[in-house]
Swiss-Prot record:
Major localisation: endoplasmic reticulum
Bias (Pro residues): 1718-1733
Molecular function (Gene Ontology), one example: ATP hydrolysis activity
Gene3D superfamilies (alphabetical): P-loop containing nucleotide triphosphate hydrolases
Family designation: Belongs to the ABC transporter superfamily. ABCA family.
Protein name: ATP-binding cassette sub-family A member 17
Positions with biased composition (Polar residues): 1681-1692
Described function: Promotes cholesterol efflux from sperm which renders sperm capable of fertilization. Has also been shown to decrease levels of intracellular esterified neutral lipids including cholesteryl esters, fatty acid esters and triacylglycerols.
Reaction equation(s) it catalyzes: cholesterol(in) + ATP + H2O = cholesterol(out) + ADP + phosphate + H(+)
Length: 1733
């Protein structure tokens, strides 16, 4: 039941995602139907026509065709005989020569090799009409012929006389040459073959003189054995050959299309399905969603079953519709008129199932969706190519070869279609009664069996590859996967084995003895390899994690925290060592472990189209919750996470913070016993982060929690034990108090300075009181000083002095605390890696407090000024105008080159190897088919066709012999045939039989005979069924053998073999054989390969768009023209490479139609003009896609359909037999707007025109009108002509399409369609205003500072714009979705030079929207904004020259290094080339990124990526720098480094606007800030101004030791209430209390003394007291008015779990709204500033 429940959930998930991916789902279901529509269109435009009976006249075989009498030759035709040593053969040949009125020359050859060598090498061999080779060893020259005679007739390889007009279809109806490799045409038809030829037509047995020569040789043999008798007999005997009559029939030209094009179209229709399936499966794999579900208990096989059922249902619908369309008569015709619809459905379903499993198999070999999709689709197409060869040699293939070829599902499908079309041609269709009928020792039933076998094999391969080679993610299974799995010996949980103590034992706290170690890690290593280099991410890690505890894992960026989490969750395998979870080893028992595992990854693993509720419901039930419990817990989790108002929002529309909340909820739901949380609160605002802390504190009771974070206060609050990693090694581990005790150096005093602060004077004051004080940090407005613990008795005097001289010293506020976790972390990092000591280097004295640890301010100023210190000491001027455009163009071009260089495997495979491989395989198959298969000997006996029925009429008492009938019967029986003597007309009998039993008639009745006596003369008619290629000669052989037996006895026999001559030297060199249809094969195959090539140009553009790198480049100053034209230039250069290689391939294969000296320029021109047209089209369409993988798949499908379909339609309808040439011309003109059609038709016409020229030349038609023979096709001497078979109009169309699509691209980039829509909305202004007013009736801000700022801007706008770098006036932003959203509401502010302006607010408050408007990523709905005097709305190009932007999410290109990216943006900014290196090096030095500067960005940690994003914003000369949460994901050391850099940039005269969730960051950096709530400013001013206005109280935080928590907590509360009357308990986190104390009558020194004593009396682990912080003010604004302490506690009681653990506490409810009334100011502040203790 549990398995069925999980399966049901997975199916629900799949169908929800498919339903919400409307376009993909429609594409998956409709693309096969679109190809079906093409088939239906062809069916309806090739209607069957009724034809009456046809009788053909007899042909006299005693005469050569007229052709030989009129052929203009300089020399005589020659009759060659072999071996020449036999005089007997010479005499026989001379008798043959004398038979005809044509003057022949008799020529003998000693042996067959000499004859063939002469044919191949000597030009005179053209005159040899036939070689007669007798299979008999002559001992002497006069030795007679035996009675059993066998000889070969070797006519020329190419017919001389029979000129069949060439076909312009993808498949020829007939095979060229003598067709000796085939018994029947590959394309059977109900209509008579070669309808207009009485002698049978192709392969030309009569026209080429084969029958006449054969009969003459047979008569000569008879005369040799019975000279007189033979002479007498043939005086009164006349031998004729006559074609079978053909009864009334339906001539259906569609059958040719069905037999040949339908397999190709069916394959192309299902390739779309294969691409979508592969992409869907790989997308989940690439995003780690599959492995994430596995961690929730979903076995891998269950995952596959769910996917199979999902796609099975969707393809079932498609196949059902296809079956209905194919089998339902429309306008009295159907695609399959006679076949059983049930069998058609079963056949298509078997193929669909095989396609599904093929996609599954291909997905296991790849990790990236777009790579796997491209290669998977290519391989799927390749598996069809063998059929193109097999179909033309089907009867030559052995049964084993056929079986093996059908292991490719496409070959099996095409073979099945072949069976269906054959039965349709016979008029019976495929039925249950004939599925076992054998055609070439194979049957339709076997095809169905092979499709099912293919499905099983593909499934098996997928299972083995995934199990044994999980590649990047997952744990590989053992090779004995099918064997009985040995039961692992699980050691006792508490005694798995104590890990050895590391060398840093003094910093490892003793393990708790009374708790269960749920997770044990023993000597764990993880090494990553990249080429020859390796990186050790985890080095000898040993530690235990305990139930009921939160273990916090800290470390700098890249220390190995995420790697540890990935190993424990089974996402990656350890290189060495062991890890046990609940006693199960991760490398062996991951399935068991995952049943109790909850994981919140560092990067959200969410389904884009799942809602918040869907995620919680899905994962809750996967973990075992019942639907009712899951519903309740989902509602509870929504409330706890503050996501109630987003319950129905899809995850792709959530902000980053909301996604983190959802990921945490997924990990927590259903009570997972082991929680691994990788930076769970990254990106969350302060209220949300605190709510998550509450939630984790409540939920940890019976769980084991491993948490990583960069927030030290989070680690301090949540961590029962804290472990710190550095470079993969464990440095220390223990409780927060233990680590503070080990690493603490005393008390830390944090001083927030004013701009007027005199640092030297302040240092002297501190040094005067505390001589041993040490400077830890001096960044921005923040200064941190260490006060040794032994000098605590001097603190009171120091604090009194600082309070009294606060204004004089320039102190905004100061605070003191005992050692914090941040300081512990920094000290640990310094000890482990001295390179991190750049900013935190200890000072041995504060006097004179130099800042030598920082880069001087003047060095950073050079980045943002007009001069730059170089050796020449010349001022640096930024490039402008044309020079800037050239530099930017060069930067964009280098970016494209770098992408191609770094992704060379992808570029090489998709853009070069793939199209070339397709064309090479096609050429290999086609060349082998056309030039090799036909040159085989064929023995002309009835046994070749199996057992047949031979009707015959012989008159009673025939003049030839009264026993003639009996002799004929004996001869047939001896040959294994069935004689059937009839009375009357043989022709009438054959017509009757064909009408009575059309099924199988052509295979049962191949030849017949009629012996008619008229007076004393006998007429012998050898009747042949022309549906069989070689029946004319067979019928003649049958009659001649009977006559030979009459003359020489029953033992006499003649066996004739048709063995074409080898190709002559001229034929080989000039490829005389017409190969026009081969060109269409190549075109269709090549169009598919070129679709992948074309779609590959979207990968980078969509990738840049998805990470918003393109937007950042535009913001940095790149114009639309520069961005796209540089990309187009490089992509055209890239397009030239496969084009030139393609020409080389044609030269290698000697494909003259494309490799001729006149054709090569045309091929290159066609290809390059196609690239010119299609690349801008791909760029334009790429705007519709969000991920490179989906873009690649959809574009391949689109380009394949829009290129192959038009070419097929136009080519098929152009066939003269269909009678739709006018329609073909119309379609051709319509499809000129499609580059793929132009490419296909141009190449097709180029090939076809060349082949027709060869055809006319080969047939020696220079003296007659070749165009008449070609049935209307006009050979163009000038291939560039516009007329039929010219390529001129296609080249012109491609040349015009390029600018058209480029214009569309620029219009799309400029949001022209959005602007047009907005302009059109102006026709209904009253409606819009009324609608806006109804929805956005928002109150004006109440804060007087906000109102004053807005009023000032209104009054003095022009003056402010001139004097200030940034002015924002009443800016609003409305997102016009289904429900319009007001994101920013009339915001006004001014930012001056050397000012850092902070935007604070909850997630979704509108901060990023302001940035998007300032950078013009989003248009301003109303209002104005000015940068350096330029209006953003009208002068965006000029504005962008002055803006530097660090977006919220890293807009970085993974294929570039950090240095390369900075260089690129330096060029975009216009920094002269000679200064770029120094500029970039300086930024890297300041950001401490020199070590990783030359590594690829994809290897960077999150913190390093943020650092690089900030560096990009600083490049060049931006007057205004916008930093959107720049320090997200950074460790404390990196964060302080960033602060230092930003502060120095501000000091250099720049204007900075910053958003952040770190209040500490805002206090350190911001000179002014505003708090936003629901798009409005609620307050505005400097941090100190806001504290003075709203923070007139003190904040006391105290942390009681957990050991004494219950005992001392209440006593301490009573102490605070008694000591500080009026205090208010604002928050409580188990052992952490936060009080707000009234401000009046409190002194810093007095409070410090009281709390020092309380620390001892009440077992306090840590405490602090400070003026109400900026974070407290922020929380006050963002907290709902109704959220009082009592109400919060009441909500906690309701939401608490039914049986909470003993150490759990009530949890505070997170804010449920994003707005609150402005807090009222408290009474005036006391004269002294409080201190953080």
């Amino acid at each position: 039941m549990e398995v069925l429940k999980k399966l049901k959930l997975l199916l629900w998930k799949n169908f929800i995602l498919k339903r919400r991916k409307t376009l993909i789902t429609l594409l998956e279901m409709l693309m096969p139907l679109l190809f079906c529509a093409i088939v239906l269109y062809l069916r309806l435009n090739s209607m069957p026509r009724k034809k009456s009976s046809t009788n053909y006249p007899a042909v006299d075989v005693s005469l050569l065709p007229v052709y030989f009498y009129n052929y203009p030759l300089k020399s005589k035709f020659q009759l060659a005989y072999i071996p020449s040593k036999s005089e007997t053969l010479k005499a026989v040949t001379e008798v043959v020569e004398q038979t005809f009125a044509v003057d022949f020359e008799v020529l003998g050859f000693p042996s067959v090799p000499l004859f063939e060598d002469y044919i191949i090498k000597d030009p005179k061999s053209f005159y040899i009409l036939v070689g007669i080779i007798f299979h008999h060893d002559f001992n002497s020259s006069n030795e007679p012929l035996p009675l059993v005679v066998k000889y070969d007739l070797r006519f020329s390889y190419v017919q001389r006389n029979f000129v069949s007009p060439p076909r312009h279809l993808f498949f020829q109806e007939e095979i060229e040459g003598w067709c000796t490799a085939f018994l029947y045409p590959p394309n059977l038809s109900q209509a008579p073959r070669e309808f207009s030829y009485a002698d049978g037509g192709n392969p030309g047995y009569n026209k080429e003189g084969f029958l006449a020569i054969q009969h003459a040789v047979d008569k000569a043999i008879m005369r040799h054995h019975a000279p007189k008798a033979a002479l007498n007999m043939f005086k009164d005997l006349h031998v004729l050959v006559q074609r079978f009559p053909f009864g009334p029939h339906i001539q259906d030209p569609f059958l040719v299309i069905l037999q040949n094009e339908f397999p190709l179209l069916l394959m192309l229709s299902f390739i779309c399905v294969e691409l979508i399936i592969t992409n869907s499966v790989l997308s989940e794999k690439e995003r780690k969603q599959k492995e994430y579900m596995s961690m929730m208990g979903v076995e891998s096989w269950l995952h596959w079953v769910a996917w199979f059922i999902t796609f099975f249902i969707s393809v079932s619908i498609t196949v059902s519709v296809m079956t209905v369309l194919f089998c339902t008569k429309i306008n009295r015709v159907a695609v399959f008129r006679n076949s059983n619809p049930t069998l058609i459905f079963i056949f298509l379903m078997c193929f669909a199932i095989a396609t599904i499993f093929f996609a599954f198999m291909m997905s296991t070999f790849f990790q990236r969706a777009h790579v796997g999709t491209v290669i998977g689709g290519t391989v799927f197409f390749f598996t069809y190519l063998p059929y193109m060869y097999i179909t033309f040699s089907y009867h030559q293939r052995t049964y084993t070869q056929k079986i093996l070829s059908c292991l490719f599902s496409n070959v099996a499908m095409a073979t099945g279609v072949r069976f269906i079309s054959l039965f349709e041609a016979e008029g019976t269709g495929i039925q249950w009664r004939n599925i076992g009928s054998v055609w070439g020792d194979f049957s339709f039933a076997q095809v169905l069996g092979m499709l099912l076998l293919d499905s099983f094999l593909y499934c098996l391969i997928a299972f083995l590859v995934e199990s044994l080679f999980p590649r990047k993610f997952g744990i590989p299974k053992s090779w004995y996967i099918f064997a009985k799995k040995p039961v692992p010996e699980i050691p006792p949980l508490l005694n798995i084995g104590d890990p050895e103590k590391p060398s840093k034992g003094n910093f490892m706290q003793d393990e708790p003895t009374n708790q269960m170690n749920t997770i044990e890690i023993q000597h764990l290593y993880k090494v990553f390899y990249s080429g020859r280099s390796k990186r050790t991410a985890i080095r000898d890690l040993s530690m235990n994690l305990y139930k009921g505890q939160v273990t916090v894992l800290l470390g700098h960026n890249g220390a190995g925290k995420t790697t540890v989490c990935s190993v424990l969750t089974g996402l990656i395998t350890p290189s060495k060592g062991h890890a046990y979870i609940h006693g199960c080893e991760i490398s062996k028992d991951m399935v068991q472990i995952r049943k109790s595992l909850g994981w919140c990854p560092q990067h959200d693993i969410l389904f884009d189209n799942f809602t918040v509720t869907d995620h919680l419901y899905f994962y809750g039930q996967l973990k075992g919750l019942s639907p009712q419990d899951c519903h309740e817990q989902t509602q509870e989790m929504l409330h706890l996470l503050g996501l109630k108002d987003k319950w129905n929002s899809r995850s792709k529309f959530l902000s980053g913070g909301m996604k983190r909340k959802l990921s945490i909820g997924i990990a927590l739901i259903a009570g997972s016993k082991v929680l691994i949380l990788d930076e769970p609160t990254s990106g969350l605002d302060s209220p949300s982060r605190r709510a998550i802390w509450d939630l984790l504190q409540q939920q940890k009771g019976d769980r084991t929690v491993l948490l990583t974070t960069h927030f030290m206060d989070e680690a301090d609050l949540l961590g029962d034990r804290i472990a710190i990693l550095a470079k993969g090694e464990l440095q220390c581990c223990g409780s927060p108090s233990f680590l503070k005790q080990k690493y603490g150096a005393g008390y830390y005093m944090t001083i927030i300075k004013t701009p007027l602060c005199d640092t030297s004077k302040l240092s002297e004051v501190i040094y005067h009181h505390i001589p041993n004080a040490v400077l830890e940090s001096n960044i921005g407005e923040e200064m941190i000083v260490t006060l040794p613990k032994k000098t605590i008795h001097r603190f009171e005097a120091l604090f009194n002095d600082l309070e009294l001289r606060q204004t004089e010293l320039g102190i905004s506020t100061f605070a003191t605390s005992v050692t914090t976790m941040e300081e512990v972390f920094i000290r640990v990092c310094k000890l482990a890696d001295p390179s991190t000591n750049v900013l935190t280097e200890k000072r041995h004295s504060l006097h004179p407090l130099p800042r030598h640890h920082r880069v001087p301010v003047d060095r950073i100023k050079c980045l943002h000024s007009g001069t730059f210190p170089v050796s020449t000491e010349q001022p640096m001027r930024l490039n402008t105008g044309f020079c800037l455009l050239c530099q930017q163009f060069y930067a964009m071009l280098l970016k494209k080159i770098t992408y191609s260089r770094r992704n060379w495997m992808l570029v090489l495979s998709v853009q070069v190897l793939l199209p070339l491989a397709i064309i090479m395989l096609s050429l290999t198959f086609f060349n082998f088919k056309l030039r090799k298969l036909d040159n085989v000997p064929l023995e002309l006996t009835l046994q070749t066709y199996g057992q047949t029925i031979v009707p015959f009429f012989i008159a009673e008492n025939s003049h030839l012999d009264p026993q003639l009938s009996d002799d004929f019967v004996k001869m047939l029986v001896a040959a294994g045939q069935v004689p059937l003597r009839i009375q009357g007309s043989v022709e009438d009998f054959l017509l009757k039989k064909a009408k009575e039993a059309p099924e199988g008639f052509d295979k049962l009745y191949v030849v017949a005979a009629s012996f008619e006596d008229v007076n004393n003369h006998t007429t012998v008619k050898a009747l042949f069924n022309n549906q069989a290629y070689h029946s004319p000669s067979l019928a003649l052989t049958l009659v001649d053998n009977l006559l030979f037996k009459l003359l020489s006895g029953a033992n006499a026999s003649i066996t004739t073999t048709n063995y074409p001559q080898p190709q002559t030297a001229i034929e080989v060199s000039e490829s005389i054989l017409y190969q026009g249809p081969k060109g269409h094969y190549l075109v269709v195959n090549f169009l598919f390969g070129i679709a992948f090539l074309s779609s590959s140009f979207s990968i980078l553009t969509v990738g840049e768009k998805s990470v918003k790198s393109k937007s950042l480049q535009f913001v940095s100053g790149v114009s639309t023209a520069v961005f796209w034209l540089s990309a187009l230039l490089w992509d055209l250069i890239s397009f030239l490479v496969p084009t030139l290689l393609l020409v080389l391939v044609f030269l290698w294969y000697k494909e003259e139609a494309f490799a001729h000296h006149e054709s090569i320029p045309a091929v290159v021109l066609i290809m390059m003009l196609y690239g010119w047209a299609v690349i801008p089209l791909v760029y334009t369409v790429s705007f519709s896609f969000n991920t490179p993988g989906s873009a690649c798949v959809k574009l391949v499908v689109m380009l394949t359909f829009l290129s192959i379909s038009p070419v097929v339609l136009v080519t098929v309808t152009s066939e003269k037999d269909l009678g739709y040439t006018e329609l073909s011309d119309s379609l051709d003109h319509i499809f000129l707007i499609l580059p793929g059609h132009c490419l296909g038709m141009a190449l097709s016409n180029l090939y076809y025109n060349f082949e027709l020229k060869k055809f006319c030349s080969a047939k020696n038609l220079s003296d007659i009108d070749c165009n008449d023979v070609l049935e209307g096709y006009v050979v163009q001497e000038n291939i560039y002509a516009w007329e039929s078979l010219g390529i001129g109009k296609y080249l012109t169309a491609l040349a015009v399409l390029g600018p058209v699509y480029i214009t569309m691209l620029f219009l799309t980039e400029a949001n022209a369609f959005y602007v047009l829509k907005s302009r059109l909305s102006g026709f209904f202004p009253s409606f819009w205003k009324e609608k806006s007013g109804m929805i956005f009736d928002v109150a004006e801000p109440e804060d007087e500072d906000v109102l004053e700022e807005a009023e000032t801007i209104k009054r003095y706008l022009e003056t402010l714009v001139k004097k200030n770098p940034l002015v924002v006036k009443e800016v609003s932003k409305v997102y016009k979705d289904k429900v319009p959203l007001l994101a920013v509401n009339k915001v006004s502010f001014v930012v001056k030079e050397e000012e850092c302006f902070g935007l604070l607010g909850l997630n979704g408050a509108g901060k990023t929207s302001i940035f998007n408007m300032l950078t013009s990523e989003q248009p301003i709905t109303s209002g104005d904004a000015f940068v350096k005097g330029f209006n953003i709305k009208s002068d965006i190009a000029k504005v962008r020259q002055w803006i530097g932007y660090c977006p919220e999410f890293d807009a970085l290109l993974n294929f570039m290094t950090g240095r390369e990216m900075l260089v690129m943006y330096a060029r975009i900014r216009g920094i002269p080339e000679c200064h770029i290196k120094a500029c970039v090096d300086l930024i890297l030095e300041n950001l401490l990124m020199c070590v990783c500067a030359d590594k690829l960005v994809k290897t960077y940690s999150g913190g390093n990526k943020r650092m690089l994003s900030t560096g990009i914003a600083l490049v060049g000369e931006p007057a205004v720098i916008l930093l959107d949460e720049p320090s997200t994901g950074m460790d404390p050391v990196a964060r302080r480094l960033l602060w230092d850099t930003v502060e120095r940039v501000r000091e250099s005269g720049k204007t900075i606007v910053i958003t952040s969730h770190s209040m500490e960051e805002c206090e350190a950096l911001c000179t002014r800030l505003a708090i936003m709530v629901q798009g409005q400013f609620k307050c505005l001013g400097s941090p100190q101004h806001l504290k003075s206005k709203f923070g007139i109280s003190y904040s006391l935080q105290a942390k009681v030791r957990r050991k004494w928590q219950q005992q001392m907590l209440e006593e301490f509360k009573a102490f605070v209430d008694l000591t500080f009357p009026g205090s208010n308990l604002e928050d409580e986190h188990q052992n952490m209390l936060q009080y707000y104390l009234p401000g009046p009558n409190l002194s810093w020194a007095k409070v410090f003394s009281i709390m020092e004593q309380a620390k001892k009396d009440y077992m306090l682990e840590d405490y602090s007291i400070s003026q109400l912080s900026l974070e407290d003010i922020f929380l006050n604004f963002t907290r709902p008015e109704s959220s009082t302490k009592e109400q919060i506690q009441q909500e906690q009681a309701v939401l608490a779990s039914p049986s909470p653990p003993s150490n759990s506490r009530p949890i505070s409810s997170p804010p449920s709204r994003l707005s609150s009334p402005t807090p009222k100011p408290l009474p005036s502040p006391p004269p002294s500033e409080p201190i953080l203790l």
